[in-house]
Amino acid sequence: VNNLKHYVLYGLIALLWLFIILFVVFSEPAFGYSNNKEFIQSVNKCADYLDKRYKKEERIPRKLLLTQAALESNYGRSRYAKEGNNLMGIYQFKNLHTGMTPAGNQNAKFRVAKFQSKCQSIEYYMNLLNTKDFYRSFRNERELQSKMRVNDVNRYFYLLYNYSTNPEYPQLLKKTYKEITNMGF
């Protein structure tokens, strides 16, 4: 009976350590920043964490992801980033009561989605690009670039023209990409 108690106790201790290790290794990274460079570093850490869930061919090209996060959230300074953890400018068209009303557009037929964490908004974005028909040309280009072993992020900018209603979106992405590149990313 004493040996059984010891085995149970050791088993519980082992399970506790396993839980702690899994929590530390697989928990979402902290998302803190006070300037543009720290914002990009935080997005990068989140992307590293999320990439573990995707096959290599399903991963979003990192520089594209960083560029869109910076542009869509103004480096994490937008109202949607601060109040709704939405770094990617993601709208919702159902359950409008759960999203944020766009400023100056109270009658909008959409809301800006809210997320429990900033990393969760990035994961949602990754799933959008990997599953929605709107982004099939993006996925085809990603596959082609992978086969050719090139990474031309500028080609993606034009394929994501329908990510935004702004006709200048590809040019804005290019400008933001240059900013990020100048920061050393």
Segments (PLM) and residue ranges:
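Catalytic cores of secreted/periplasmic lytic hydrolases that degrade extracellular macromolecules
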Residues: 2-67, 71-185
